[in-house]
């Protein structure tokens, strides 16, 4: 199989390049990450990428695969058009090769305060929810912060320091929707400006690339609805 892989070391390279590799590997039963690790182990130890769990859980191996963001560890080689083009997630600074600087994503994630705010005295056991209340969080808590969604979003490319992005806004709604949280008004205040939320234009790139099948666009729409209702 043939692979065309993005190579760039900012400390030594004047500009990025695509490097071609050929690997004798059976597509059936193998994921893209399997091939990349074999290339690194057998052909070019300088190839740099992130990986950890290899099960689509940690989110560390997000990359752009034949023009679409995804996780290398759960992307089957079967069906990928050759040469398989592998690039870093777009819109983020490249540290080296397929490794990007996640700081812009992490800063926006932190800005929505992704933790429960509850002023009541802490109970001796966990704060309880009914099954119906917990069901409100389905499709929200499964996010693994891989960055595939925000790095597929043109609005996030345009100004990552102002627009929170799909990943951060999904997290924001996850806590707005949580019955145990008491900070809804402050959370909405935090998003009520022309950029942080309303730069989302609903093109749904985030939905099409999410490896967990989540819908950040729907969550963003619900936040917009809450803000509109609050202002009327």
Regions found by a protein language model. Give the residues of each.
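Active-site phosphate-binding and catalytic loops of NTP-dependent enzymes
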Residues: 44-50
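Short, contiguous acidic and Ser/Thr-rich linear segments
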Residues: 19-30
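Short, structured protein-protein interaction patches enriched in aromatics and acidic/basic residues
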Residues: 53-62
């Amino acid at each position: 199989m043939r692979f065309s892989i993005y190579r760039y070391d900012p400390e030594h390279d004047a500009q990025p390049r695509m490097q071609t590799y050929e690997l004798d590997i059976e597509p059936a039963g193998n994921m893209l990450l399997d091939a990349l690790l074999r290339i690194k182990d057998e052909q070019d130890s300088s190839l740099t990428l992130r990986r950890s769990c290899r099960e689509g859980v940690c989110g560390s191996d997000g990359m752009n695969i034949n023009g679409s963001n995804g996780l290398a560890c759960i992307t089957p080689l079967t069906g990928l058009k050759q040469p398989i083009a592998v690039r870093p997630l777009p819109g983020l600074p490249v540290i080296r090769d397929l490794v990007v600087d996640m700081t812009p994503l992490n800063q926006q994630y932190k800005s929505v305060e992704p933790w429960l705010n509850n002023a009541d005295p802490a109970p001796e056991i966990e704060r309880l929810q009914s099954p119906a209340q917990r069901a409100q969080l389905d499709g929200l808590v499964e996010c693994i912060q891989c960055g595939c969604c925000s790095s597929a979003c043109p609005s996030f490319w345009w100004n990552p320091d102002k627009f929170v992005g799909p990943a951060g806004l999904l997290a924001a709604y996850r806590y707005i929707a949580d019955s145990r949280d008491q900070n809804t008004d402050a959370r909405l205040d935090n998003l009520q400006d022309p950029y942080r939320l309303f730069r989302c234009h609903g093109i749904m790139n985030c939905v099409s690339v999410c490896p967990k099948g989540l819908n950040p666009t729907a969550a963003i729409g619900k936040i917009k609805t809450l803000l509109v209702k609050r202002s009327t």
